[in-house]
Regions:
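Alpha/beta-hydrolase-fold serine-hydrolase catalytic core, especially in secreted/extracellular enzymes
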Residues: 180-189
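Gly/Ala-rich beta-loop-alpha elbow adjacent to hydrolase catalytic centers
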Residues: 12-21
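Catalytic histidine neighborhood in serine/cysteine hydrolases
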Residues: 144-158
Length: 189
């Protein structure tokens, strides 16, 4: 408000970054017209498992830097040259302490925060049909029964936005302008 912002047309979050967006949605006083969550951000993993996975995830991300992106296909579903620089930079800048804190503060095995039904009607929780975290979709649907749950058929975690950033941006603009998903051939509703 102090900077003249009266409302937000859309909040967009991907993967485990969605924890921050969900916290924002539950705490902000600004009206939010739409939200779009892409991927398996709602995985609920016990604290002990998150602690055990941290060193392995750290080494996996660091290996992307050490190998100049050569290990990307072994870690993720793709090795697109267009996204390698982002993962290489992430691997270079990652510290174990920051990753440990982030993992312990996200993916928590606890109830989802409540959201007003009216806001739920304007939230899109997208999952790719081939991503590992597709199994969490039912839990999200139970927590937010008024939400929208498109499935990107044949897509993996965050694959559409990585492979077609322009198409992804156009889809978000369509949602913000028309309050519905565009007709895309790979969307299962």
């Amino acid at each position: 408000h102090r900077q003249g912002v009266e409302r937000l047309a859309m909040v967009v979050a991907s993967s485990i970054g969605a924890d921050l967006a969900m916290a924002f949605l539950t705490q902000t006083k600004l009206p939010v017209e739409h939200a779009f969550f892409d991927g398996g951000q709602f995985a609920q993993i016990g604290k002990g498992t998150r602690r055990m996975m941290t060193p392995f995830l750290y080494l996996a991300i660091k290996s992307l830097y050490w190998s100049k992106g050569g290990t990307l296909k072994k870690i993720l579903w793709c090795d697109d040259d267009s996204i390698k620089p982002y993962f290489i930079d992430a691997g270079e800048n990652l510290t174990y302490t920051n990753l440990r804190r982030h993992i312990l503060d996200s993916l928590e095995d606890k109830p989802f925060p409540s959201l007003p039904e009216e806001l739920q009607r304007h939230i899109y929780f997208e999952f790719g049909s081939t991503e590992d975290h597709f199994k969490y979709r039912q839990a999200v649907m139970k927590a937010y029964p008024c939400g929208n749950y498109p499935v990107f058929e044949g897509y993996n975690h965050m694959q559409y936005q990585i492979r077609d950033p322009k198409g992804f941006a156009e889809m978000l603009a369509h949602i913000a302008e028309r309050d519905c998903m565009p007709e895309l051939p790979f969307i299962r509703k």
